[in-house]
Amino acid sequence: MSSFNNETNNNSNTNTHPDDSFPLYTVFKDESVPIEEKMALLTRFKGHVKKELVNESSIQAYFAALLFISGHYAYRSYPRLIFLSHSSLCYLIKRVAMQSPVQFNDTLVEQLLNHLIFELPNEKKFWLASIKAIEAIYLVNPSKIQAILANFLRRPSENQNGDYLNRIKSTLLTIDELIQINEKNNSNHLQLLRFFMLSFTNLLNNNLNEHANDDNNNVIIELIFDIMYKYLKMDDENSQDLIDGFINDLEVEKFKQKFISLAKSQDQHGSQEDKSTLFDEEYEFQLLLAEAKLPQLSNNLSSKDPAMKKNYESLNQLQQDLENLLAPFQSVKETEQNWKLRQSNIIELDNIISGNIPKDNPEEFVTVIKEVQLIELISRATSSLRTTLSLTALLFLKRLIHILNDQLPLSILDQIFVIFKNLLSSTKKISSQTAFHCLITLIIDINHFHNKLFQLSFLLINEKTVTPRFCSAILLRSFLIKFNDSNLSLNNSNTTSPTSKLENNIIYIEEWLKKGISDSQTTVREAMRLTFWYFYKCYPTNAKRLLSSSFSPQLKKATELAIPAHLNINYQVSRVSSTASASSATSRLYSHSSNNSSRKTSLLEQKRNYPSYAQPTQSSSTSLLNAPAVTAGGSVIASKLSNKLKTNLRSTSEYSSKENEKRARHHDSMNSVSNSNTKDNNNVTKRKVSAPPSSTAATKVSENYTNFDDFPSNQIDLTDELSNSYSNPLIKKYMDKNDVSMSSSPISLKGSNKLGEYETLYKKFNDASFPAQIKDALQYLQKELLLTSQQSSSAPKFEFPMIMKKLRQIMIKSPNDFKPFLSIEKFTNGVPLNYLIELYSINSFDYAEILKNRMNPEKPYELTNLIITIADLFNFLNANNCPNDFKLYYMKYKTTFFNYNFKLLLEIFRNLNIKHDNTLRSGTNDLMPKISMILFQIYGKEFDYTCYFNLIFEIYKFDNNRFNKLLADFDIVSTKMKICHELEKKDANFKVEDIISRESSVSFTPIDNKKSEGDEESDDAVDENDVKKCMEMTMINPFKNLETDKTLELKNNVGKRTSSTDSVVIHDDNDKDKKLSEMTKIVSVYQLDQPNPAKEEDDIDMENSQKSDLNLSEIFQNSGENTERKLKDDNEPTVKFSTDPPKIINEPEKLIGNGNENEKPDLETMSPIKINGDENMGQKQRITVKRERDVALTEQDINSKKMKLVNNKKSEKMHLLIMDNFPRDSLTVYEISHLLMVDSNGNTLMDFDVYFNHMSKAINRIKSGSFTMKHINYLIEPLITCFQNQKMTDWLTNENGFDELLDVAIMLLKSTDDTPSIPSKISSKSIILVHCLLVWKKFLNTLSENADDDGVSVRMCFEEVWEQILLMLNKFSDYGNEIYKLAQEFRDSLMLSHFFKKHSATRILSMLVTEIQPDTAGVKETFLIETLWKMLQSPTICQQFKKSNISEIIQTMSYFIMGTDNTSWNFTSAVVLARCLRVLQTTPDYTEQETERLFDCLPKNVFKMIMFIASNE
């Protein structure tokens, strides 16, 4: 029976014959068909429904077949089949609701509702898709759904068993879902609730047996009460009347009393919740504001007249007024003329935010202020030197936060926080105190925890000035009061996450407290001590451990004496000091009762008495190196926060909404039960959040069924219609199972238009101004276009001109939203072709789909119009005269338009060249000049030149003769020559001389035929001289290889102009113009020597000059004789001079091997830099730089040992054993090579005894503190030249030589930390020294009995070296230092030596979190992030990492990629995150959901970038 597979090949066309549809019913009724083939057919059918329109004649058969499957197969036996058929049914309902809603007749709707609500397993994974399907039917026929649900509640049943009560419960839950859908879609959900309240009353009065089981009845009553209480708030007068009326209508007294008791318990529960919080928030906030008291301001600034508010009816008018009011802020510079205007405009802005728009339409208002850049422009006023203007701007931002609070996205809150933070350090105390006050009110006003604001507040503790650090202590206190776990659980009933964001940031809080309590300023210390006890109140275990282990006894005592009395903390003081009374005043400041909570003075103004041990102390800068290890759960960095912090979730930005969805999905998935179909279910109901809706990640189903992967996606894709996350508390409370996470309802299509009646649509479309309205209008337009495509020709046509102006505006603003429209024929026929071309380009539409209808021989005008439109677009882009409103749009997509249309034209001409269709070619041939000339004109713009020249070549092949004529007539010679060059590469028969001639290349004066022959020659001579001068200045001859053109022959003297390359102008030596060309001539360092054109009188005897080696002093003494050179203690490089001109190091004959002229020279031998002896340094070398040993040798030693780099003797390349332990091309090898002296055979200069004596002297000199660079060289040379030498080995191991050298090396590294700047030479040599010691350590380990494979001894020896190098890097101002490169190479060697382990990553993360110094260049942080990347690349270290470790790395890197403008941090952290993703993908238990959870701290676009980087590693 496998033949049915052939019946499904042609099912994408909506007009296909019924016989071509999926034979679902036939196959599933046939018992002989194996279940695997049935599931394969059903899988393909599901993919078809998700991606394409269905055959309308088969819709009823499809519904019958899918309902048959659920009734014929048991879920226990076929769980995969039942779930697959259910999801297919739900997608089919969504498809039919969109494509052909008339199919939903009354009988079918009732059957579907009965099946979706009652006949499926009582599991959430089925409930989720069922609600989505019911929603689709409800949007088509809401009244029918309401009537059926009400009828389900009306049906009496004499036998009220458990099944009956379950039916009622399922019906009630469905009603709740519908009300919730109406509420989310901004419909009148209360009206729908009132409709069903009548059914609730009838159910309780008539259909619920009062004598039945009380537990079952109570479940129904509680569910009804929860539904009503959920939408009818008890504090609303009208809602209270509805509740009272409902209770009065109940006839069964038992049920009435139950309802009344539920209402009372709900009120009591609410009041108990308010009283059970850890802190009295109102009182605590008063104390915080007293700490950050607003300075005494004038009445105009501090007070706000409630009557002064401005209301708007139109959002466009609001935006226009905002732009006008912000005009004075456009100028960066504040002038005498504009500052008063700025202040008055801020007051007007304050009136606007007090009006109706921010309250009634907060999301749209936020969008407007983003577009007009309100925050950026107001920030210019906050930094004004005029105090009144600055304070006015600050208070305006404060009121803006208070009015919008959680409606403001994190990006705007971040901007405002930074504005306030910058003013904390202001020299004007009134500005600083006002900014302090505004920062505290910012945290008080927001209701959601934002990790970015938490991190910014934490960084304030590192500021240099006192006020930011004091503010940081108060901000931490506000976070603890506002976002502690008790507040989180009480204010968010849906929250079940085991940890809060604040709890996951405990490591930051602890470091925060340690820095504040040990601060040098008393005000900061005292404020942080009070904050500590708020931390103790929230997390007593962590606070006790911190107090006992992280503070000195003095600081601990001072902290214990600062316990606020009003917190009622039960803490036993370790030992009460006799001076406790001295600090009691501080405690009394926080012991006021709530009746006397308003204090007249702030803590900043109190005169404080403190004991001697609490005097200002210096904060420790080294305690952070020993940060405690993190827990296995990875709670050091914040990982997740439940999306149910408040019922009024902020969804004003795509980022925040996606974050909420991801958190909800993670939260629900924590409770999932793993079963046999978990993998399939996840694939069906979930998609990767970072993937776009049309990605393959969203359409993938079970790995066993991938037969429909090749389905086309050019129609409306329903893949994501059933996969958006949501959470309903009633489902969690009343559903029996929690198998899979729930999902939120998609944005519905609002309204319904009858066919042919488009006036309402036109008005709704043109009036749409808010983003939500525009999105709804587009969805409705899409639906109407799909419906009208099936109408008869007599039906009214949709008039695109009625909405074209608005449609164009939306295209400019959101062109990607039109991708699904490009496959709708009605849309492509109604929209102008030039708009379509732009949409095709931006959405990367398939070229074949465009040309399928455009290259029809019967309609050649279609192709002609397409080419003309593209040419006009090129002209428009080249002219660059677009309207101001569209400039940004064309600037953004200009390159995209060019590249896409190049490829589109390439396909057109390629097809024309292959098919040779005369009809199409004739129409195109007339357009060839136009398209060719515009292509010539746009050369030089920003686009893909490979595609450009491929298109040029195809047009050239289309009609090469005509193309050559067009190109020859083109004016710009440079463009012409480049095109000719590319065509010459592609076509061997192409001749450049046919295109470029003298007349077309150089502009000459026209020849007068009346002139005499002598005049003509004179004119030619002038022209030729001009050309000659032009070529001499540039040294380039553009007319090479053009000997055939007689007009280019120079008539002066051909012999005077010769060139070895035909493109460089060469003068005769006697020519007076030679000096100009010699000065401007450019000679490559790899160019072969040319014969020396020296004159005879300037000749010098080469051999005689080679015999003498002149010193600089001998030249000054005019002595030509050789003198005996003396070797000083500190030798300097000697330079040998010669009378010959400088020569290139490599001789011509050396560059060509075996006489083969075509053989390419070795680039290594051609390099002018030679680290080792070079074989090519022959007698022609005239400049030699010598490096000699800094060793005091005897004259005999010098004569016998020293190496001379002389011209008459070739030196051998040295190779030492230790060199094999360094990378070949490393900077370490380069530096080492300059320390060595070898003779011509490469042997070492001295024996071990000589080296050892020098090394011993150097150790003593360095320890005494008086040494030079040569003494450091003495330490390094024996380690290199005597590597694996037995005497050296014995001394290092048996005589404690290794430890002695290591101590000296650490001493040298520490000496670099004593100065503000880095001594580069000492630092470089010190790193080379420890690098050599590391190589020796690895060698010595191999000689021991127990080889150190795990790097234990290496870590013990080089731990302090690593710390000193990090301290050194902290002083760097840039990355262009050789010390940084040497440190990188040393770090890589440590990596290979197993120095780094899993705990090393934890310490690095701790340093990155706690030791960030904003006033440095961040070189150290970049180095540490690079180290993490290296560790993640090491397989041995990666095996030690757990997911919690990877999560910590991801959370920390999220700050460095998003929370800073340092590009080096951004790049290196992005690479680390990409590597983390690769590591997670290689784990055995890898799942996309888990990865999304780990990366949910990143915005969607950043995560996409990380995925791209990871895929290209």
Curated annotation (Swiss-Prot):
The keyword Cell cycle applies. One of its GO terms (molecular function) is microtubule binding. The modification Phosphoserine is found at residues 997, 1018, 1063, 1167. The modification Phosphothreonine is found at residue 1047. Residues 586-603 have a biased composition (Low complexity). Belongs to the CLASP family. This is Protein STU1. It comes from Saccharomyces cerevisiae (strain ATCC 204508 / S288c). The lineage of its organism: Eukaryota, Fungi, Dikarya, Ascomycota, Saccharomycotina.
